[in-house]
């Protein structure tokens, strides 16, 4: 037996659609999927070039493509298109391991920090199509890293900060990452996680990695390879706060994400 809980009126009044509108949208999505998704893509995404085909499906070959011919950038859609109306509004609310550790990041701040890292990555030779491993704690810089990669067309691969050096190494090698973004240490449930040490151990068999960009999370001393490693703060400090986005095809890869086989 199930219970139905009615949505409070003060919340229902702020919903984008009502049940009748939802039913109509759902019906269209089933009966006219290309029309439906074309309307959604035009409404909610900023395109630099419109698509030629909404969807192309070959069930015999198992090939599916969306919005072929269209061009856009995920970073500009996540940040830039919101700036005219929301520059001073909060984009990210971050809370650290301790509830007292908190920060609110506006869209303008997010834009500038993402652009600074994007410029820093370009300075380190990262370009469109390159793979970047992100092995970080839950800090704002993790979001900046993903968005900065998207801005320059690099393909990011997020690896959970609780994974072992061997698991990290496997993912770096398989995805052919040449750059790693990490932190000196992470803090999880009051426990220190030796991220940079894990990265160094993982890279003992990853000869193609040429850059390790490290955020100072705890400030504790960590192993350092001056020929390869650079502090995140030093890389981004003097970078311009604007960065031209790379124009990407709709079917270009955005990220590589490995399952732990437990989900």
Predicted regions and their residues:
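AMP-dependent adenylate-forming
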Residues: 78-105, 216-223
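Conserved pre-ATP/AMP-binding loop-to-beta segment of ANL
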Residues: 88-90, 212-214, 225-258
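Conserved AMP-binding/adenylate-forming core of the ANL superfamily
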Residues: 75, 92-147, 164-169, 228-234
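Structural core segment of the AMP-binding/adenylate-forming
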Residues: 151-234
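A short N-terminal helical cap/helix-turn-helix that marks the beginning
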Residues: 30-52, 70-93
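Conserved adenylation A10 loop of the ANL superfamily
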Residues: 99-101, 256-263
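Short, contiguous pre-domain boundary segments
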Residues: 1-24
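Adenylate-forming
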Residues: 29, 79-83, 110, 114, ...
